[in-house]
């Protein structure tokens, strides 16, 4: 893989990942979002934040060596830069996020503090509510686009 293109897996997550890969689910969610909301989400792109103030500075498919130290980088599951609704990030949280709550909350705070509309899909919470991931995603996206969600 070329040096400039460093995806989450090739950039060090491969050795850390113990649970099931969410790749198939992310591809399915990306396709659903494109079909339903006509938004083009990118999978595993990088989001760079100012280290001191936390505001959003850069969104990039890859990160070069010089940029690595310049910004605080995050690698969200799905990201979209929409003309009408701004930057939207979708995070699919599995069991690891239930154990690393403080880190997950810090991530969410960083995204929201940077003016990003964040959709967090916690798999355990969704199952507990007897919903599907798509149903929860639909509801959260409808909130972002300004259409109320019909709840049971």
Describe the predicted segments one by one.
Residues 1-152:
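Nucleic-acid endo/exonuclease domains
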């Amino acid at each position: 893989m070329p040096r400039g293109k460093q995806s989450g897996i090739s950039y060090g997550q491969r050795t850390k990942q113990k649970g099931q890969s969410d790749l198939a689910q992310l591809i399915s969610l990306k396709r659903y979002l494109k079909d339903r909301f006509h938004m083009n989400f990118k999978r595993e792109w990088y989001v760079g934040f100012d280290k001191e103030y936390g505001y959003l500075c850069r969104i990039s498919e890859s990160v070069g060596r010089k940029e690595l130290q310049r910004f605080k980088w995050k690698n969200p599951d799905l990201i979209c830069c929409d003309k009408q609704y701004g930057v939207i990030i979708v995070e699919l949280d599995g069991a690891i996020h239930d154990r690393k709550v403080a880190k997950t909350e810090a991530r969410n705070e960083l995204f929201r503090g940077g003016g990003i509309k964040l959709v967090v899909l916690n798999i355990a919470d969704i199952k507990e509510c007897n919903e599907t991931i798509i149903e929860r995603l639909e509801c959260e996206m409808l909130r972002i686009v300004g259409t109320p969600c019909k709840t049971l």
